[in-house]
Amino acid sequence: MRRRDFLTATALAGTVLPLQRAVAATTTAGNGRKFVFVVNYGGWDPTRVFAPEFDNPNVDMERDAEPAAVGGLEFVDHAERPAVRSFMETWASRSLVLKGVLVPSVAHENCLRLCMTGTTRQDASDWGAIAAGVVGADFALPHVVAAGPSYPGEFGAFVTRTGTSGQLPALLDGSILDWSDVAVTAPSSRAETIMDRYLASRLRAWNNQVAGGRDTILGQAHATAHDRALTLKGLREIVNWSGSSGFGEQVDFAIDALALGVSRCVTLSFSHNGWDTHVYNDLYQSQNFEVLFQGLARLVDLLATTPGTEGGTLADETVVVVLSEMGRTPQLNSGQGKDHWPYTSMLVVGEGVTGGRVVGGYDNYYYGRPVDLASGEVDDGTGAAVSSDVVGATLLRLAGVDSETYLPGVATLDG
């Protein structure tokens, strides 16, 4: 059976709110929102897609680019980036752009941690890990990282990497035994089934006889781990667990993991020619954005056509967060590149957000403009910065998590 047919056969089956609220006040049934994080490490240039600063004399824009808009979503149009226009024309109504997001550093690793956890604390958990650990613990792999960064913090038990060398599929099919320096013979399929059944019966017996306390906790944890292992082994011929090399393979893996109910959160990574464009900024940024939006279009198309786990499609259940840990300076340097800048932009697509809208902006110095967090409108007088921790707190709220527990005192973007 083809993977696509299997997903359809086994499936268990965005309204815009008044006042143009950027984030929905309610969640899907049972806090069931799923998340896909697409991390673009290196620092993209928002002025090549998200920030049409053509009227700003302090910003170097491409001479052959033009401002464009689909509904209320403004973007930078360029003949060499047709995938960007195509994506906006198709999905603008479900897309929200956050402009001028403050990430208070210009060092890659610090910015990446700030962008994904809201803090530079080494023990902090990223948004996907928190969402998976707090309200997604029943999934076999609550947060799976196909590629890119991960900050599990206290939720390490809920985060899994597929591995850059096929470690996860090797674990599932038993071929990891071949990696051992000591010869090990794997049991036959029949013997493995007998052992699985025996272990399950022993776990049931143990959990039925223990009186509570530490033994009960350990027994239940062991039983849960065993159930998850059986679930994953049952899918080892269906899912391409090693799909972490190219972005297209990562997208396929994400769709499988979400549609089959394996994961609540998936992290992907896109690089192509690399985003850290200290030289030849326009050449590499343009190529990167074109290929990125080709991949994003495929991701969102698949979400919209793949049955979800709660009825409808995955698009009705999933939020896609596309980010880069920093922006680039407003002006080109002597090498026709751009250097690090602490203001970036983000793209959020899918369930729970008001699409066709831009929140935030840039001032004449290309600093992020403050926003009234209650309305989402720019407020240069009394507004607050749209900082990475505010974005994170808002995403946690979308996930059904009390953000105050993990980002105390940080406001959310309600408008």
Regions of interest found by a model, annotated:
Residues 3-415:
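Ligand-binding pockets and gating/stacking loops
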